[in-house]
């Protein structure tokens, strides 16, 4: 049994299906899609459905595999907390959202359970998350800025649809310029 490689996927929790997106990644590796989906859904039952879970798949020479689960990326957490569908197109010049240090700390607590971050002090993880927030155009402050106090009225479930709408608008604007 020889180690062949490590592959990354992002799969929605508890609702993985043998779909083309998963099939294109697992097919060349010789991994049975339905078997993977069944095992993945069993391990992610306790997690809220449709949360994008990072999966590391380790393939072995005898067509077997092991996989490890990680929490969603920091960007996903920041977008959900700040209630913004996308990051800023001009990060240092345009602020699209706001999160507090307390919220950053909660994200860091969640991320500290990831295998690569075990043993790293929380303040270091917080610094990384603050850097990610700055790169996305999300301000990090002690208290919420007055212009972002209404963020709690935006439903988190609408963020993905808002993101799709923004992308469609940008595509149509690009087509109009040609």
Predicted regions span which residues?
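Short, ordered loop/turn segments at secondary-structure junctions
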Residues: 14, 72, 143-146
């Amino acid at each position: 049994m020889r180690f062949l490689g490590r592959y990354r996927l992002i799969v929605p929790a508890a609702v993985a299906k043998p779909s083309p997106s998963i099939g294109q990644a697992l097919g060349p590796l010789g991994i049975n899609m339905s078997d993977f989906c069944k095992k993945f859904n069993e391990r992610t039952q306790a997690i809220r459905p449709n949360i994008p879970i990072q999966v590391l798949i380790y393939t072995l020479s005898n067509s077997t595999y092991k996989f490890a689960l990680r929490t969603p990326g920091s960007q996903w957490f920041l977008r959900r907390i700040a209630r913004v569908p996308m990051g800023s197109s001009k990060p240092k010049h345009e602020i699209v959202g706001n999160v507090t240090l307390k919220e950053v700390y909660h994200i860091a607590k969640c991320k500290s359970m990831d295998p690569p971050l075990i043993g790293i002090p929380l303040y270091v993880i917080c610094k990384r998350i603050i850097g990610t927030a700055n790169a996305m155009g999300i301000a990090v402050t002690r208290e919420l800025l007055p212009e972002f106090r209404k963020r709690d009225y935006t439903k988190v479930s609408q963020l993905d649809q808002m993101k799709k709408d923004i992308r469609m608008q940008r595509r149509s604007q690009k087509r109009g310029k040609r």
